[in-house]
């Protein structure tokens, strides 16, 4: 093989392994999927499939006290019932604790993280944002949280739907927790390490997760890893302003009749499904969605009030 052919082969490998779209849906097993969950799942699925990309599923079982027995399996069965088939195997955060701890240990040993014993009450008294009290106090590991040194704050990021998102300086500068005092690993650390492990290229999720995005970008830079792009979908809220959520007892979507809920979710996401689509097979409904998907049609809002919950 000549030098040109070898270079071309290397280029092809690079293009197929490093630039291929990989998206994901990462629910927490705190209850069944509801209409708000379906919006996030469908939006991330259509964004991936419309680019012939991979769509992965990760179960974020990071907080056992909030989890409901059997919810993870129920979520997966619901995705299957809705035709939202994923690529590869499902990742479970409960099986990734070793990776999280290894990274924390590396940062602790390198001086990039430290133990903190400040209480929520103390932080509230200090103004609501952590002022770095324990950064140079060499606290013991016992009864301590672990915080990351934030020496280069992320003051803004660009969202693919909402444009530039500015982050308040007090929030951007805060040394944030990467392992809680009770020993549980923080969401921001886990989600970034998992997205890197799964080669995620873009995160499509609900707008309720806009705020922690700056911290997640900061973790990518701390890890010297290229950050993903972000697209935050509008949230479905009730007329009193509450987000549809498991905590607010949003009803589970119907596994036995997926097409009406899928069409409603497509409409919520700015698509215009034809009236005849309700009569089509599930696979044809999803294929219509893949063909019609365009992020330019997404409502540029962080919340949309539903007149009816699903």
Curated annotation (Swiss-Prot):
Per its UniProt record, what SUPFAM superfamilies does this chain match? Nucleotidylyl transferase
**How is the cofactor bound here?**
Binds 1 zinc ion per subunit.
Cofactor(s) required, per the database record = Zn(2+)
Residues the entry annotates as binding Zn(2+): 116, 118, 130, 134
Instruction: State the Gene3D superfamilies in the record.
Output: HUPs
Q: Does the keyword Nucleotide-binding apply?
A: yes
Pfam families, per the entry: tRNA-synt_1c
GO CC field: cytosol
Looking at the keywords, is Cell division present?
no
Q: Which domain of life is it from?
A: Bacteria
The record ties this protein, via InterPro entries, to: Glu-Q_tRNA(Asp)_Synthase, Glu/Gln-tRNA-synth, Glu/Gln-tRNA-synth_Ib_cat-dom, GluQ/Sye, Rossmann-like_a/b/a_fold
Spans through the membrane:
none
Q: The motif 'KMSKS' region: which residues? A: 243-247
Signal sequence span is none
Q: What family is this protein classified in? A: Belongs to the class-I aminoacyl-tRNA synthetase family. GluQ subfamily.
* Protein role: Catalyzes the tRNA-independent activation of glutamate in presence of ATP and the subsequent transfer of glutamate onto a tRNA(Asp). Glutamate is transferred on the 2-amino-5-(4,5-dihydroxy-2-cyclopenten-1-yl) moiety of the queuosine in the wobble position of the QUC anticodon.
Protein name, UniProt field: Glutamyl-Q tRNA(Asp) synthetase
């Amino acid at each position: 093989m000549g030098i040109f052919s070898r270079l071309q082969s290397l280029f092809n490998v690079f293009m197929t392994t490093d630039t291929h779209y990989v998206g994901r849906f990462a629910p927490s097993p705190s209850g069944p999927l509801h209409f708000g969950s379906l919006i996030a799942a469908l939006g991330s699925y259509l964004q991936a499939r419309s680019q012939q990309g991979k769509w992965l599923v990760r179960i974020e079982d990071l907080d056992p006290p909030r989890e409901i027995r059997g919810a993870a399996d129920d979520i997966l069965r619901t995705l299957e019932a809705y035709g939202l088939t994923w690529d590869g195997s499902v990742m479970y955060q409960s099986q990734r604790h070793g990776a999280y701890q290894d990274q924390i240990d590396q940062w602790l040993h390198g001086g990039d993280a430290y133990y903190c014993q400040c209480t929520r009450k103390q932080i509230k008294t200090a103004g609501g944002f952590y002022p770095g009290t324990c950064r140079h106090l060499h606290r013991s590991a016992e009864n301590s949280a672990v915080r990351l040194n934030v020496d280069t704050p992320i003051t803004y990021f660009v969202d693919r739907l909402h444009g530039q998102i500015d982050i308040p300086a007090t929030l951007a500068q805060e040394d944030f927790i990467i392992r809680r005092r009770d020993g549980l690993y923080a969401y921001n650390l886990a989600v970034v390490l998992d997205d890197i492990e799964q080669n995620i290229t873009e995160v499509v999720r609900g707008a309720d997760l806009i705020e922690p995005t700056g911290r997640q970008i900061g973790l990518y830079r701390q890890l010297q890893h290229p950050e993903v792009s972000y697209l935050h979908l509008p949230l479905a809220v009730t007329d009193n302003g509450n987000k549809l959520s498991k905590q607010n007892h949003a009803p589970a979507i119907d596994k036995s009749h997926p097409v009406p809920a899928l069409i409603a979710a497509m409409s919520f996401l700015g698509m215009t499904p034809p009236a005849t689509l309700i009569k089509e097979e599930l696979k044809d409904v999803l294929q219509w969605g893949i063909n019609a998907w365009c992020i330019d049609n997404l409502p540029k809002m962080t919340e949309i009030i539903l007149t009816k919950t699903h």
